[in-house]
């Protein structure tokens, strides 16, 4: 038991300088992109089993590194994502006077989270429009898939699954790799 506690303390101590840099990514005085990239690469392959800090908190993406990029970039998109303990999630994106809110369910297995997007809510200048069913093969998505068609070979329309592989999470910052291979830093959204 004591050995496990010492190992945990050693891991946390080793990660703390990198986590400190990642915490600053969402501040008014962020680190340089090179410093943030180095910290992200140092922390991305760590092992963590407690994902409780992710739940019931709104997160906003602030920094991202593509798989083959030498350096990451700070994100300017106004977006927030929340994972609730009941297995539901929302992902909100703001663009000028528009707000898109994707809602659905997720399954967390180990460090992998699979998202199933079910509804899209749109607000124009704060006025809500009717919710749209965007489940695969249902509603408007079925129409788009039938018009768009599929790949040769009769497999139908195929898309990359919505999967995050979580790398790190504490009360103020989390790191996840998406199905595209890009890795992002998310910070707790204020308010």
Predicted regions and their residues:
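N-terminal chloroplast transit peptides
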Residues: 1-16
């Amino acid at each position: 038991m004591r050995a496990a506690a010492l190992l945990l303390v050693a891991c946390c101590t080793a990660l703390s300088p990198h986590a400190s840099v990642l915490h600053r990514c969402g501040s008014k005085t962020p680190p340089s992109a090179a410093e943030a990239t180095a910290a992200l690469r140092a922390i991305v392959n760590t092992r963590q089993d407690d994902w409780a800090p992710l739940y019931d908190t709104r997160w906003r993406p602030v920094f991202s590194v593509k798989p083959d990029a030498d350096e990451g970039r700070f994100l300017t998109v106004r977006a927030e994502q929340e994972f609730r303990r009941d297995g539901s999630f929302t992902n909100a994106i703001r663009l000028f006077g528009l707000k898109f809110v994707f809602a659905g369910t997720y399954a967390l297995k180990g460090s992998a989270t699979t998202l199933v997007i079910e509804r899209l809510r749109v607000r124009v200048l704060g006025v809500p429009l009717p919710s749209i069913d965007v489940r695969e093969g249902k509603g408007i998505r079925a129409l788009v898939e039938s018009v768009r068609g599929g790949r040769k070979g009769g497999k139908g329309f195929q898309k990359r699954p919505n999967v995050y592989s979580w790398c790190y999470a504490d009360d103020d910052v989390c790191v996840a790799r998406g199905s595209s291979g890009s890795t992002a830093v998310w910070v707790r959204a204020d308010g």
